[in-house]
From Swiss-Prot:
Its EC number is 1.14.14.160. This is Zealexin A1 synthase. One of its GO terms (biological process) is defense response. Involved in production of the antifungal phytoalexin zealexin A1. The enzyme sequentially oxidizes(S)-beta-macrocarpene via alcohol and aldehyde intermediates to form zealexin A1, a maize phytoalexin that provides biochemical protection against fungal infection. Belongs to the cytochrome P450 family. It comes from Zea mays (Maize). The chain crosses the membrane at residues 7-26. Keywords: Heme, Iron, Membrane, Metal-binding, Monooxygenase, Oxidoreductase, Plant defense, Transmembrane, Transmembrane helix. Pfam families: p450 (PF00067). GO terms for molecular function: heme binding; iron ion binding; oxidoreductase activity, acting on paired donors, with incorporation or reduction of molecular oxygen, NAD(P)H as one donor, and incorporation of one atom of oxygen; terpene synthase activity. InterPro entries: Cyt_P450, Cyt_P450_CS, Cyt_P450_E_grp-I, Cyt_P450_sf.
Length: 505
């Protein structure tokens, strides 16, 4: 097998060199954005793999080469955007030119050949899927309809924590948060806790990890030989088939429940999709594969980002005790005398500081630091530079949100920076784009925030939080794990102390 791989790589190298020589002779010279020096065949990859977190490596490179920087990841031209002005040029001024997604072979497999909305190619099918998602799955009314689910899952979460507090135990809060968000999202998506839940989430976790890998097949997409030898491709096929098997069973069971008149089955996202599937007037065909691809989007984008943001909120509050005390005082004053908090309570209370905490966590710890890559649909000029058709584009929102030119004390957690500010995460303030901007902005931001706000308020209301013996706030690790989503690298282990016991604790 090793000999085959070496032969394949050698063949690709020869083809790549000949192709570049031909291009140099036949193509006019372009004014490309600056970038670091490259090596034959691998291009700029050696600059990126020096750091396990590519967005950090890209920030350092951008300091030298500018806010529009060209890298070559193997044979893939890659534009890195690292300033608000450049982000606005890509996501607003030239939004249509960059409205496509860069899809590698593994992502194409996982999304049933790009049938989904998040990674689907820009066009009529994509427009209809996005419209359907925004109006039917992620609308304010749909998010509101899941209120009871969120309240029940938060109450269950609080009872579990109260039991640990009574026993004097420490907890891995990051794991508990992930479990809580997953349970909530499964019920919102499928309608109830699912016996296949653990299997599906395990397959999804593998799929997301494979999608983020910098595999040989993905950096040399023109080589069919390397594609066929790629282990990432085989992992993607196995993960997709496992998810399809589980989702297929869920779809069949949901259809049976709907046919039998089970009203509870009509409350979930998957039931909405299956109901629309029967609509003859729908301008696109909503096949079972499309439904499964959309469920991949919803789970992948919804569960990880919400749990990651809630974990970072608690991490930073533990690191900054004065900020924690201020947030707790606001929540405890607003809900004084209550044994549990509901979303109706949240809507009537003016928890201004709590919202600032969430905003600041999203700034300092953007859930998807490079967003999802776009692709240049047509050759164009951006800020005086030529951008070739097919260029992969990363917007480094992690770097932009930590740029000291736009943020005072950029590396510090200061929710107060948003006081007397109109900045929001709706994609119109280009120095603050945790959910992106333009046609490819994440449409599920409202659901993601709704899934974490009640939980955060409850964590602050019901419990005080202590670090394990011997640890100081400054010792809490804030390094991110490698991957598409910037999860906390080390679990947040804390000792909960009951302040106001939740109901039935």
């Amino acid at each position: 097998m090793e000999d085959k791989v070496l032969i394949a790589v050698g063949t690709v190298a020869v083809v790549a060199v000949l192709s570049k020589l031909k291009s140099a002779v036949t193509k006019p010279k372009l004014n490309l954005p600056p970038g670091p020096w490259t090596l034959p065949l691998i291009g700029s990859i050696h600059h990126i793999v020096s750091n396990p977190l590519p967005y950090r490596a890209m920030r350092e490179l951008a300091h030298k080469h500018g806010p529009l920087m060209m890298l070559w990841l193997g044979e893939v031209p890659t534009l890195v955007v690292s300033s608000p002005e450049a982000a606005q040029a890509i996501t607003k001024t030239h939004d249509v030119s960059f409205a496509d997604r860069h899809i590698n072979s593994t992502v194409d497999i996982l999304t049933f050949n790009g049938m989904d909305m998040v990674f689907g190619s820009y066009g009529e099918q994509w427009r209809q899927l996005r419209k359907l998602s925004v109006l039917e799955l992620l609308s304010a009314a749909r998010v509101q309809s899941f209120q009871r689910i969120r309240e029940e899952e938060v109450a269950r979460f609080m009872r579990s924590l109260a039991a640990s507090a009574s026993a004097g135990a420490t907890v891995d809060l990051s794991k508990m948060i992930s479990s809580f968000i997953n349970d909530t999202f499964v019920r919102e998506s499928i309608g109830s806790r699912c016996k296949y839940q653990d299997e599906y989430l395990a397959a999804l976790d593998t799929a997301i990890r494979v999608a983020a890998e910098l595999s040989v097949g993905n950096i040399f997409p023109s080589s069919r030989v390397l594609q066929s030898l790629s282990t990432a491709r085989r992992k993607a096929i196995a993960s997709r088939d496992e998810m399809a098997r589980i989702l297929g069973q869920i779809i069949r069971e949901t259809k049976e429940s709907m046919d039998q008149g089970d009203k509870t089955s009509n409350e979930s996202m998957i039931s909405v999709l299956l109901r629309l599937q029967k609509d003859a007037g729908l301008p696109i065909e909503l096949t079972d594969n499309v439904v499964m691809a959309l469920m991949f989007d919803l789970f992948g984008a919804g569960s990880d980002t919400s749990s990651t943001t809630l974990t970072w909120c608690m991490t930073e509050l533990v690191r900054y005790p004065a900020t924690m005390a201020k947030a707790q005082a606001e929540v405890r004053e607003a809900f004084k005398g209550k044994t549990t908090i509901t979303e109706d309570d949240l809507s009537t209370a003016n928890l201004r500081y709590l919202k600032l905490v969430v905003k600041e966590a999203l700034r300092l710890h953007c859930p998807v630091p490079l967003l999802l890559p776009r692709k240049c649909r047509e050759a164009c000029q951006v800020m005086g530079y030529d951008i070739p058709k097919g260029t992969c584009v990363f917007v480094n929102v992690w770097a932009i949100c930590r740029d000291p030119r736009y943020w005072e004390d950029a590396e510090e957690f200061k929710p107060e920076r948003f006081e007397n500010s109109n900045l929001d995460y709706k994609g119109t303030y280009y120095e603050y784009l945790p959910f992106g901007s333009g046609r490819r902005m994440c449409p599920g931001a409202n659901l993601g925030v709704a899934n974490l706000e009640l939980a955060l308020a409850s964590l602050l209301y019901h419990f005080d939080w202590k670090l394990p013996s011997g640890q100081e706030p400054k010792d809490v690790d804030v390094w991110e794990a490698a991957g598409l989503v910037a999860k906390k690298n080390i679990g947040l282990v804390l000792h909960p102390v009951s302040h106001i016991a939740p109901v039935n604790a």
